[in-house]
Amino acid sequence: MKRSDITFQKLLKILDLAISEGFLTNNAAKDGINHSKGYLFSKENSSFLKSFEKKDLAIDLGTGGGLPGLVLATFTDCFWLLTDRSERRCAFLKKAISDLDLNEKVEVVECSAEELSLGDYRGKAKLVTARSFASPAITAECAGPLLREGGLFIVSEPPFNNPTDNQDRWPIEGLVDLGLKQKEQWHTGLAGYRSFVCVAKCSEIYPRRFNKITKNPLF
């Protein structure tokens, strides 16, 4: 069996275990690998993907059962931080990383996303990803401060019949405060995605404490 096939089978087993642990639903795990790869492995991101170096930092917010961060870490060469505030989920992710032989290029950080943005990783990430993390405003405020200029923030989008419904979720004026600008929008046939580029350093007032973010979102 090819190494790539072995890795794929390991990922499937890990996602099955995530279901049994209550970290993923059956539907999320079913297409989890392909859905996760859709964040980066598309024609819209081909040049960005090719520019990745081993020293580059990517961060996945609220990795939970492994989507998309664990999958993307498996198929990319850069260094990944997988974040989650749950001790139990972090223990699961650490075991998964070991099973996939990713210890040298992946680290699990047990903390909230806004806490991470206030530390040493602020302004360091070339890529930040999030899936079903929170509302657009909350997710953007947690992601924006982590990005370096030129870095990308990529999210998966819920299904909508009308594309403008998704557009309204990410108002330009709200993103400007975080130094973000919409870059691309694409659909793989399985799911839709949206990327934002960091065009300016995020203001030092962000992120706010989580209770303030939720009570008074930017948009």
For each predicted feature, which ranges?
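SAM/dcSAM-binding transferase cores
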Residues: 166-219
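Class I SAM-dependent transferase core
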Residues: 1-59, 88, 95-101
